[in-house]
From Swiss-Prot:
Pathway: Cofactor metabolism; coenzyme M-coenzyme B heterodisulfide reduction; coenzyme B and coenzyme M from coenzyme M-coenzyme B heterodisulfide: step 1/1. The gene is hdrB2. GO terms for biological process: methanogenesis. It comes from Methanococcus maripaludis (strain DSM 14266 / JCM 13030 / NBRC 101832 / S2 / LL). This is H(2)/formate:CoB-CoM heterodisulfide,ferredoxin reductase subunit B2. Belongs to the HdrB family. The heterodisulfide reductase is composed of three subunits; HdrA, HdrB and HdrC. B1 and B2 subunits are interchangeable, as are the C1 and C2 subunits. The heterodisulfide reductase forms a supercomplex with formylmethanofuran dehydrogenase (Fwd), F(420)-non-reducing hydrogenase (Vhu) and formate dehydrogenase (Fdh).
Amino acid sequence: MKYAFFLGCIMPNRYAGVESATRTVMEKLGVELVDMPGASCCPAPGVFGSFDQKTWLTLAARNLVIAEEMGTDIVTVCNGCYGSLYEAAHMLHENKEALAMVNEQLKEIGKEYKGTVHVRHFAELIYKEIGVDKIRENVVKPLAVNIGVHYGCHFLKPTAAKGLGNAEHPTMLDELVEATGAKSVDYKDKMMCCGAGGGVRAKELDLALSMTQEKIENMLAVGADATVNVCPFCQLQFDRGQVEIKEKLGNEYNFPVVHLSQLLGLAMGMDPKEVALDVNFISPEPLLQKLGY
């Protein structure tokens, strides 16, 4: 299997360990990730798409064209990038007027979107194409810890377009986490936003942090040792957000934050430094001690 690897903005700039872990995990699972030359921001669906749909759709289509020219589908590890690119491809497939408008814009740079590319999320690809059993087979260090899974907003919704199962009671990420030997613990308001999305973090930071704090407290209440996400923006909100919660709200949690690719990397025998857990704002030490590092 070969995929065009869409990096997005936050992962290469803030969480390079997520990229490193993703590349290593995918290589071990037999998936070749190919860089996309000239790829731009997805762009963010909750910001660009809300204020200027034409610009959002054209920029997203330009990224899709890069993958088309490479002759392969796209995979990303970011919910926002997945939401933006997937929804753009879906809209261009369903709306011929939108397709004509976009191609009129792309003509100015000598490009045309043909609609041949599919957009996959890293977690969806692993779950559907590789399978939970294959993950279990590759585990060399079972992770005997409790994990609070955070799905995020753009991974599953809009449900009708993505078709990844029940958006209110999903199991996909829980199954992948438990394939590592960890236990996925259920907690109150599991499907609530991390607090960062839709421009909330940028415009109403206090509100965003109160949502993050509520989710962390709900996970801690059921004995979670860490939270696992599938989006660098969610990772930023839980990780950097804890520093801001301490500064603004006076509460300190030191609750480890891990991307799914990093968790899979640990289970497959990668060192914590290989997946760059040591460069998070929040120390992973409480989690690593429980794992015997």
